[in-house]
Amino acid sequence: MRINPTTSSPGVSTLEEKNLGRIVQIIGPVLDVAFPPGKMPNIYNALVVKGRDTVGQQINVTCEVQQLLGNNRVRAVAMSATDGLMRGMEVIDTGAPLSVPVGGATLGRIFNVLGEPVDNLGPVDTRTTSPIHRSAPAFIQLDTKLSIFETGIKVVDLLAPYRRGGKIGLFGGAGVGKTVLIMELINNIAKAHGGVSVFGGVGERTREGNDLYMEMKESGVINEQNIAESKVALVYGQMNEPPGARMRVGLTALTMAEYFRDVNEQDVLLFIDNIFRFVQAGSEVSALLGRMPSAVGYQPTLSTEMGSLQERITSTKEGSITSIQAVYVPADDLTDPAPATTFAHLDATTVLSRGLAAKGIYPAVDPLDSTSTMLQPRIVGEEHYETAQRVKQTSQRYKELQDIIAILGLDELSEEDRLTVARARKIERFLSQPFFVAEVFTGSPGKYVGLAETIRGFQLILSGELDGLPEQAFYLVGNIDEATAKAMNLEVESKLKK
């Protein structure tokens, strides 16, 4: 792979001698291009098709070389629609991989996969660009410090804490709240952490991308008055884009994050919504290139593609990238090859449960399925670890007793088990929390709960001090003091009704 200098945009240095080819075949988003003998472009080189279609409209399509076919032909995947392209059209080899703008100029702006701004706010300074294909940092450059990344979300901080500079996966089926949780994390972290973030919208709904942009402007994460003061860069390759764009948009976002880490030596947050769509786009491209499908119809190169992206998301001695990735789980099946391959790369997994969402408990994080490598006494401390383990034990016991309750009813349980069930139901409700980004839906103001407050609250429930309070007092509150205040209000209301 040839890498162009960091301070040139694709094709600038090589367009003088113009290595030209011609389109010989078009199959949807895949083009076959013939080049003169001895002038074949490298794999991953960007090719540009310029010209006019049959009605005189200007065409400008960028493609990426994927295969060398022999007979001086290459197969390339288009990064935008191929409407209007015809056989015989001229194709320019830029001599370098796709390069995108990086650095402070990207903050507050929305880009497509090619690094072109799509927010109608004028051009972006492209003096500093970087190729989207790079190798992962060497072992010797990696940083191995362990520290907790506080999110202000009770269930996450207590039971599956995130690692600073780690990789976190949000697993869930359709409609259980992955994107809302990501938006809340962006909101909380931008306020409390103050670092820069890069958001990669990979194959998700355009409406959600627009909502996120509007919310970021409202909350000040994107500063409209002074765009350079913004804290986030957005890169979108949404559902309506061709598979080539959806497959590469994650790399575009990652390249921007790597610059902040390596050159600016900052701690960066990289949000990817949704990593499953990256796999899905790779599967589409693989089929279009004629590769034999593997398990469940996925591409045979699934592990390689996932590894090449994930291994670049890491912390070095210069700075860190903490990555939070939403992972769509097809048909709620965690053994599907796409989520199963993703699991191997993660430091923490937050699993969203349809059962909890159906009960109205949001965030619908499953306390028993969610895991973290950080939940160890030597990292989080004895108090945190003990509290988390007791919460899990109580929840597990409640889960075991549910069958008995369904058949025989609560009255058939022993006194001890009834107490466990009562506390587990309080814990289940106290794990819910009103979100800032969901205020418009719930009508409840959002709450940020510090880790110490979270631990104190669960210790009080487990100790039995709050056994006398009704369980609905613990639903959608912030810290434990709000729950006791809510219980008093409920008592007053019930007396007034009588």
From Swiss-Prot:
InterPro entries according to UniProt: AAA+_ATPase, ATP-synt_VA_C, ATP_synth_F1_bsu, ATPase_a/bsu_AS, ATPase_alpha/beta_chains, ATPase_F1/V1/A1_a/bsu_N, ATPase_F1/V1/A1_a/bsu_N_sf, ATPase_F1/V1/A1_a/bsu_nucl-bd
Organism of provenance: Liriodendron tulipifera
Superkingdom: Eukaryota
GO cellular component: chloroplast thylakoid membrane; mitochondrion; proton-transporting ATP synthase complex
Family according to the record: Belongs to the ATPase alpha/beta chains family.
Swiss-Prot/TrEMBL catalytic activity: ATP + H2O + 4 H(+)(in) = ADP + phosphate + 5 H(+)(out)
Keywords, sorted A to Z: ATP synthesis, ATP-binding, CF(1), Chloroplast, Hydrogen ion transport, Ion transport, Membrane, Nucleotide-binding, Plastid, Thylakoid, Translocase, Transport
Functional note: Produces ATP from ADP in the presence of a proton gradient across the membrane. The catalytic sites are hosted primarily by the beta subunits.
Membrane topology: Peripheral membrane protein
Molecular function terms from GO: ATP binding; ATP hydrolysis activity; proton-transporting ATP synthase activity, rotational mechanism
Principal place of residence: plastid
Lineage: Eukaryota, Viridiplantae, Streptophyta, Embryophyta, Tracheophyta
Binding site for ATP: G172, G173, A174, G175, V176, G177, K178, T179
Signal peptide (UniProt feature, chain positions): none
Protein name as annotated: ATP synthase subunit beta, chloroplastic
Keyword Membrane appears in the UniProt entry: yes
Subunit structure: F-type ATPases have 2 components, CF(1) - the catalytic core - and CF(0) - the membrane proton channel. CF(1) has five subunits: alpha(3), beta(3), gamma(1), delta(1), epsilon(1). CF(0) has four main subunits: a(1), b(1), b'(1) and c(9-12).
EC annotation from Swiss-Prot or TrEMBL: 7.1.2.2
BP GO terms, sorted: proton motive force-driven mitochondrial ATP synthesis
Pfam family, one: ATP-synt_ab
Cell compartments where the protein resides: Plastid, Chloroplast thylakoid membrane
